[in-house]
């Protein structure tokens, strides 16, 4: 589960970088939405991993 948190964090950073560098005006709005969505997912998966819920329990043991 921690693997997914890292993946979501990387995706959010890439989406933000592509949207805020002026690649295209339309991609900035999409990047903002994707950044928020994947950032929330990354934080959620980190919290779940710290609590030992789901697949993170097996990864820790």
From Swiss-Prot:
InterPro entries registered for this protein in UniProt: DUF1328
Keywords: Cell membrane, Membrane, Transmembrane, Transmembrane helix
Membrane topology: Multi-pass membrane protein
Subcellular location, principal: membrane
Keyword Transmembrane helix: yes
Segments traversing the membrane: 5-25, 33-53
GO CC annotation: plasma membrane
Signal sequence annotation: none
Places the protein is found: Cell membrane
Family: Belongs to the UPF0391 family.
Protein name: UPF0391 membrane protein Ajs_0703
